[in-house]
UniProtKB/Swiss-Prot annotation:
Sequence similarity: Belongs to the endoribonuclease YbeY family.
Transmembrane domains' residue ranges: none
Keywords: Cytoplasm, Endonuclease, Hydrolase, Metal-binding, Nuclease, Ribosome biogenesis, rRNA processing, Zinc
Protein's name according to its UniProt entry: Endoribonuclease YbeY
SUPFAM superfamilies, per the entry: Metalloproteases ('zincins'), catalytic domain (SSF55486)
Organism field: Hydrogenovibrio crunogenus (strain DSM 25203 / XCL-2)
Keyword Glycoprotein: no
Species classification: Bacteria, Pseudomonadati, Pseudomonadota, Gammaproteobacteria, Thiotrichales
């Protein structure tokens, strides 16, 4: 079972342009791949404005600019791992509403599809996937496209 803490902290956005809790939960469910996630799983999705995402991006990644999504994976303390009592929390996703909307418009993508992509992308990061080198990026993008296709969305990496 997935326990999703869904937070909307962005104040100057049209709530009609934000995904619902139910949509996010559906996207999270299909993006969780790891065998260890068979039981209870907890994560947070926090929708923020540009100021908050820029501050987090600067403080945690050294990049003083906005971004679409930040992933903060949770690592169980070694003492809990040793005891076999790992917590089900996998981490936090922080997604900037304005950046997602701007990207969807600029890339001529349906807003809902881009939100789905950002949630799935972030969930894959929480599970250890990355796109630092080309091989990792190819694998991650292919998996994102496959998951999105299963949900009925076009690949975010193919242009019309």
């Amino acid at each position: 079972m997935i326990h999703l803490d869904y937070q909307v902290a962005a104040e100057e956005v049209d709530e009609a342009e934000l995904p619902t809790y139910e949509q996010c939960l559906k996207w999270v469910e299909v993006a969780l791949l790891d065998d260890r996630l068979d039981g209870e799983t907890e994560l947070t999705i926090r929708i923020v404005d540009e100021d908050e995402i820029q501050t987090l991006n600067r403080d945690y990644r050294g990049k003083d600019q906005t971004t679409n999504v930040l992933s903060f994976p949770f690592e169980n303390p070694p003492v809990l791992v040793d005891l076999g009592e790992e917590l089900p929390y996998i981490g936090d996703l922080v997604i900037c509403a304005q950046v997602v909307a701007q990207e969807a418009k600029a890339q001529h993508k349906p807003l809902e599809a881009h939100w789905a992509h950002m949630v799935i992308h972030g969930c894959l990061h929480l599970q250890g996937m990355d796109h630092v080198d080309d091989d990792e990026a190819i694998k991650m993008e292919a998996l994102e496209a496959e998951i999105l296709a299963d949900l009925g969305y076009d690949s975010p990496y193919e242009s019309d």
